[in-house]
């Protein structure tokens, strides 16, 4: 049954976003806003190329213009545009937009209701504010990498950008939408300062109290969630892996039954280090006795918080993600469609509209920059 108003209603249709950001954090933030119905205009540098091959996804449903911000006429175009926009998002180093005459104070004087979000590695203040960096650097400075991985192998190398996405993008969206609510109540906009390092530091949420209140030094393989317990990945006979998170007693009991060793449950409930090592070793040896797909079949019948480590291709075909519609077909503007990851936000009255894949840079120049009186 179709959700009431789903075809007609978009959550953010009243918001217009001027997006100067590059790479991943800003574009992913504005992708989320666009998926939720915001009118996003991407401002790109003339001649810009899609070096990562992901812009057709990141720029989905966005309009595109090209402006050379080193030219005075381009600056004037921005100042005219900003009169009509609710939100500006930028990702330059601190001070760059100010030097261009496009900082918050300058644009605020044109549009007092403007919400201006800056995403940087270290924020607009502090001794590192001008320092370059990437995701791997931000999570390192934030302490996340310090207790990841293994003692022998060193910090874990993540396959996705934690600081960029969980740090920068998601916190930027939270900040922007909070500012929108504040503006609706007060009539005033504001500047938002998103540091990917700050935001990554908050991701220490579950481990930080052990240090800040308990004085425990956070180290690899020392705590429950980072290899210091049986909560871990286990290799199967054919070289693949299973994830085991059977922390609660009922799940732990189901795990022991699934691996054919119900007698291990009593051992698993002991809190001393030696018992913990023995239990983890027993799990490791058990998983090595069967192939990956055998374990998949076995754990289908057990609620043990044990799941296979899937490839992305396998994940995209997983019945749970397919049922949730997490892969969608988006028009590419050439009469074809391309598969992309869907918007994960689902509500009772809203269905995302995927208008088109990312456009060619400057595709909307004639429509937007050459309108009379602009």
Residue ranges and their predicted role:
Residues 1-8:
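Short, Lys/Arg-enriched N-terminal segments with co-localized hydrophobic residues
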Residues 18, 58-110, 288:
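A structured beta-alpha segment of the ubiquitous adenosine-cofactor-binding alpha/beta core
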Residues 19, 35, 39-44, 187:
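Short beta-strand "acidic-cap" motif of Rossmann-like dinucleotide-binding folds
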Residues 20-34, 46-57:
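Substrate-binding/gating loop at the entrance of the active-site cleft, primarily
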Residues 32, 36, 100-242, 246:
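Active-site-adjacent "lid/gating" segments in soluble enzymes
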Residues 230-302, 306:
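Aromatic-enriched alpha-helical interface/lid elements that frame and gate functional surfaces
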Residues 300-324:
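Conserved PLP cofactor-binding pocket of PLP-dependent enzymes
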Residues 331-374:
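Flexible, small-/acidic-enriched active-site or ligand-binding loops
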